[in-house]
Regions:
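Extended, hydrophilic extramembrane loops/domains of integral membrane proteins
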Residues: 2-31
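Short juxtamembrane and helix-loop transition motifs at transmembrane-helix boundaries
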Residues: 15-25, 40-52, 71-79, 178
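Transmembrane alpha-helical segments that form the functional core of multipass membrane systems
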Residues: 39, 50-143, 147-160
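Hydrophobic alpha-helical transmembrane segments of multipass membrane transporters and ion channels
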Residues: 62, 116-121, 154, 158, ...
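Juxtamembrane helix-boundary/capping and inter-helix hinge elements in multi-pass membrane proteins
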Residues: 104, 179-189
């Protein structure tokens, strides 16, 4: 079928007439993707309304900004890719919170807690990889790249934890705000204990989402290789080792959101209280 493709009725195909002779290019497969994208946008707008619209705007801005930085790296290879992705990580977090709450209402606690969690997990992961000399990691699936594939993989580690970390930070800090608002007399110990209970519920589910999101992309290849007689351990190393590392790095980022959220919440609360005291004096 690779040399003589078989078509069914109602299949859409792409043709080329540049040589004044119609030639088959490939099947047109983007129709289903378009339907899914439109359905997703419609659901977001229908369920979340105005906030959903601004969330989509934030996603669009983040995608455009990422492509812009990658274009810069493509035009000038002397600029370090990891530096560009580090800049993108910070800006993407600010854009995400800004489109949700408005640029004038950006919550510095959430921004700083997310940045702290993502970069801390990234540094721990990269240091561990360096100490172990990347043992057990198989880069075969990305060796076709025309640039240092390890650098590209490290960049993907940094990007992988942004969304999940930001979600967890928003949930924890917003919950703590509600607790303080409804129970002003609550002390720090009780606040932290309540925050831990909230975090324990959200963190596990976030890590599970991250796990299945990463592993699902490699599962078809994993099954295909096993069906063709490959050894299970060898197949696992080749197709899942990098995904497992991404899950671990993202999982660490999610876990670090718990102490970082408490840290910046209590720090800003203390600064706010101190500011009010100074005003009274």
């Amino acid at each position: 079928e690779s040399t003589n493709p078989v078509f069914n009725k109602n299949n859409q195909i792409l043709l080329d007439n540049s040589t004044k002779k119609w030639e088959f290019i490939s099947l047109k497969r983007d129709g289903y993707t378009f339907i899914l994208v439109v359905s997703f946008i419609s659901l977001v707008l229908g369920i979340a309304g105005k906030k959903g619209f601004f969330s989509l705007v934030g996603i669009l801005f983040n995608i455009i900004f990422l492509f812009f930085l990658l274009w810069i790296n493509q035009r000038n290879r002397s600029i370090n890719l990891l530096l560009l992705i580090s800049i993108y990580t910070i800006i993407a977090i600010i854009i995400s919170t800004g489109t949700l709450y408005g640029l004038k209402k950006i919550d510095l606690r959430k921004v700083l807690a997310t940045i702290f969690s993502v970069f801390l997990s990234y540094f721990i992961t990269t240091i561990t990889m360096k100490l172990l000399n990347d043992q057990g990691l198989r880069y075969e699936e990305i060796q076709f790249l025309t640039r240092p594939y390890r650098t590209v993989f490290l960049a993907s580690l940094m990007l992988g934890g942004i969304g999940a970390a930001l979600d967890n930070v928003v949930v924890i800090i917003s919950s703590l705000d509600e607790l303080v608002r409804h129970t002003p007399e609550i002390n720090t110990k009780e606040l932290i204990e309540s925050g831990k209970n909230i975090a324990s519920d959200t963190t596990t589910s976030m890590i599970n989402v991250l796990l299945f999101a990463y592993l699902s992309s490699a599962t078809p290849f994993f099954i295909f290789y096993l069906a063709n007689g490959w050894d299970f351990v060898e197949t696992f190393k080749m197709h899942l080792s990098l995904e497992i590392m991404r899950v671990l790095c993202g999982g660490l980022a999610i876990l670090f959101t718990i102490p970082s959220s408490f840290l910046f919440f209590l720090l800003f609360k203390k600064l706010k209280k101190k500011g009010k005291t100074d005003e009274c004096n």
